[in-house]
Amino acid sequence: MNLINPSSTSPSKQSKRKHLLRIGLGVLILLIILRIALPYIVLNFINNQLSNINGYYGHVDDLDISLYRGAYIVKDIYIDIVDTTTQKQLPFFSADNIDISIEWKSLLKGQIVSELVCHTALLRFTNNASEPEQLERDSNDFRLMLRTFTPLKVNRFEVFNGKIQYLDPAASPPVDIFLDNTHILASNLSNVEDTTLLPATVIATADIYEGKMNFNMRINALAIDPTYDLNAEIKNANLVKLNAFFKAYGDFDINKGMLDVYLELAAKDRKYIGYVKPVIKDLDVVGPEDRKDSVLRKLWEGIVGVAGDIAENPKTDQIATKVPIAGEFGDRT
């Protein structure tokens, strides 16, 4: 008679099973602790990076991580410019949140790239009298700041409810002009889906003083030299809303008028060519001493930076000019 129950478990097997259970439980606890601590680790890393950008200071208030999406969300972020002379901080960029994630459709094609989605973002350029080269530096440095948020190349970038603002507090009167309700979508920036000369696209729309702005560009974002083909238009902007700008830079007032602007520009091999065409409708300037033609000349120069031939259509009360643009980019730095 067999006294050994074949269904019973030997002490050694029970001990091994308990050991494996302890290991599994320990790993689970470790993962839970890591999951809880990870947002704080990443948040401290990002804030450390943002506080050590030369000429800038930034901070993120909070951060959420979504492991199943391969994503994290930074909340209430701001980046200020630090004036090297006065050490005063000037607002440069802010956003309610930025969602940074792996772009899964590119991963399926064997490319590991990221996408960024910004909500309620503000990009502000300030004409700082103490640092006249600040505007150019701001434009060049902004794309470098994106690397703070992700070690991966950014292939897709989208902005919802954005605002792009230009301030000149030293002007008389102070100038504050902006594009509002801005939506920007840049795709294939890393040339994942297309390898043609201009594989990436940038599409943007915005409100501008009761008018609309549309912007379309094809670009090679990875090219060493600027390589792009763009067109943009502003339709039905109310010139009266821009009076502070014209008073400060043109020394005249506008009582009535609507503005359209058409722009085409292409760049390749360190050269660029295109044109800008402003069109003004129903213009009425303030002050009987002001001549319309001299005001128009100032207006063109204020808009495009150079003088152009002015054509007037009395039947439609519309005045327009077309200014060619051509030149070469400066030396690489």
Tell me what each language-model feature is:
Residues 52-54, 68, 73, 89, ...:
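A short, polar/charged loop/turn motif at coil->beta-strand junctions and beta-hairpin connectors
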Residues 76-79, 200-208, 217:
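Short beta-strand segments that buttress and anchor functional surface loops
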Residues 50, 63-67, 95-111, 127, ...:
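Extended lipid/amphipathic-ligand handling interfaces
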Residues 2-12, 73-185, 280-306, 320, ...:
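Secondary-structure transition motifs
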Residues 2-55:
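N-terminal type II signal-anchor transmembrane helix
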Residues 56, 209-211:
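Short acidic/polar mixed-charge low-complexity motifs
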Residues 56-80:
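Short extracytoplasmic
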